[in-house]
């Protein structure tokens, strides 16, 4: 009741900005996955598009895996160029091709930990090294796998609705 009376921490004037439920779910997901923070959105594409549009602007470049979810591919191929952002699609398992695709205006290296639908496994540790070397942001759609493997079985029922 404190939230509805305006006594809770945070601004919850409109639920589209935030809500106590989203705040607490994000905190629980972050704790569960061993990460600093987690944001909750209504859809995976909502998460992906907002992250990429936050990190990139007109004239920037993204290096992306060529085997990604179709909605993400369509967003990168057809929509984001309207903002002056270009994408190179590469075989993310070939680290030399990844390196060769990086340009001076590249800002993001994008992949899925396990690609949809081909189930190719990205070498996240090596991609992180490349991203650090070139001062890029590594963005990973982790739908099929947890951030940390802390147990043999991890079930996340909100999988399609969370971006951590």
Model-derived regions, located:
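Conserved N-terminal alpha-helix of the aminotransferase class I/II PLP-enzyme fold
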Residues: 1-46, 71-78
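Conserved PLP-enzyme active-site core in the AAT-like
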Residues: 38-164
């Amino acid at each position: 009741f404190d939230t509805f009376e305006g006594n809770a921490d945070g601004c919850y004037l409109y639920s589209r900005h935030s809500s106590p439920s989203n705040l607490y779910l994000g905190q629980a997901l972050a704790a569960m996955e061993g990460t600093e923070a987690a944001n909750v959105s209504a859809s995976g594409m909502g998460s992906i598009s907002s992250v990429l549009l936050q990190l990139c602007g007109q004239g920037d470049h993204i290096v992306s895996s060529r085997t990604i979810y179709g909605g993400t591919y369509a967003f990168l191929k057809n929509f984001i160029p309207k903002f002056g952002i270009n994408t190179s699609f590469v075989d993310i398992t070939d680290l030399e091709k990844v390196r060769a695709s990086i340009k001076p205006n590249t800002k993001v290296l994008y992949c899925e930990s396990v690609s949809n639908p081909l189930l190719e496994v990205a070498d996240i540790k090596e991609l992180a090294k490349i991203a650090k070397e070139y001062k890029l942001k590594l963005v990973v759609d982790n739908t099929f796998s947890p951030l940390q493997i802390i147990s043999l079985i991890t079930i996340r029922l909100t999988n399609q609705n969370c971006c951590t």
